[in-house]
A protein has these predicted regions:
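Internal metal/ion-chelating core segments
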Residues: 197, 202-288
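Conserved small/polar residues in nucleotide/adenosyl-binding loops
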Residues: 290-295
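Extracellular "leader-to-stem" segments immediately downstream of a signal peptide or signal-anchor
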Residues: 2-13, 17-105, 109-218, 227, ...
Length: 295
């Protein structure tokens, strides 16, 4: 009986030794594949020309509406072919969204806070977006980019959605809009006819880049989002690194990649009221129509 046990043990040891080279080869292949993917993920190319938000009339006193200054800075950046927009320390009230243009790096320096208004009307008119996997028109995300290249949000500053008193209360009212959006999805209603917004209670995202390439979001602190914090929709070549969260309102997912490829997420401090990372590929018929390869 003892001899039989030793024979069994010898067989097991021999089997492990025999397959060890194969396991080592598999590890090498996996590492090579991983490294090949990582080599493709470069994030945004950052422009060298710098402009200060202050030069466009912004004031970091927490009282003056700085949306016009952001709009002017983005317009200037577009005219320049790209720019690095620097936001120095201070609290910047925004009565409405920031709409990015291509080739812009938005740097929130340490001590800088973007504090968005809690007034829903400021996030109209409607923009092309997606809500829980259905493409539609809805309130603008607070920071939004559509069909852009080379966009960055960096720095040790804060993005405060300030959504606790309004948008965070909408979940109990959203059923009418949620059901209608899904019906339109199932019936394949043209996306241009799926108009929501006021009266439908579908909360906007805090940050959304839609159909964009070459994105970097790095080091910023995110809090009080109205819905998902960072929504990366139909986008590619993205780096999310060093982001810090204290976002515990309803459905404050950290990072939601949807129909997205070549995304690196690393060194994140999650403290979220929902999923930290939720990989998505749309919903129902929209998913079947728009699914693309994700890596």
């Amino acid at each position: 009986m003892t001899t039989q046990k030793y024979k069994s043990l010898l067989v097991i040891i021999w089997a492990l030794w025999a397959f060890h080279p194969c396991l080592a080869i598999d590890d090498v292949l996996r590492t090579a594949k991983r490294d090949a993917i990582l080599a493709q993920i470069t994030g945004a190319v950052r422009p060298k020309k710098q402009i200060s938000l202050i030069s466009f009339g912004a004031k970091g006193d927490g009282k003056k509406d700085c949306k016009p200054a952001f709009d002017k800075a983005m317009k200037r950046a577009a005219h320049m072919g790209g720019a690095h927009i620097v936001v120095p320390a201070g609290e910047y009230l925004l009565n409405g969204p920031i709409h990015f243009v291509s080739n812009v790096c938005l740097e929130l320096q340490e001590g800088a806070t973007l504090k968005f208004s809690s007034e829903p009307a400021f996030y109209l008119p409607l923009v092309k977006t997606s809500w829980e996997g259905t493409f539609l028109q809805n309130y603008s995300p607070f920071i939004y980019g559509y069909q852009l290249e080379n966009v960055s949000i960096i720095g040790k500053g804060v993005i405060d959605g300030n959504a606790g008193t309004t948008f965070a209360t909408w979940k109990s009212k959203q059923k009418i809009g949620q059901q209608l959006s899904r019906e339109m999805n199932h019936k394949e209603v043209p996306v241009a006819e799926r108009n929501f917004g006021e009266g439908y209670w579908l909360r906007p995202h805090l940050v959304q880049f839609f159909d964009c390439k070459n994105i970097t979001i790095e080091d910023v602190f995110i809090t009080n989002a109205p819905f998902w914090c960072i929504h990366l929709l139909k986008s590619e070549n993205i780096i999310c690194r060093g982001i810090r969260y204290d976002a515990k309102l309803v459905n404050n997912d950290g990072i939601d990649p949807e129909y997205t490829r070549n995304l690196l997420i690393e060194n994140i401090e999650f403290n979220n009221g929902d999923d930290n990372v939720a990989i998505k590929c749309g919903r129902d018929n929209d998913c079947l129509l728009y699914t693309s390869r994700c890596v």
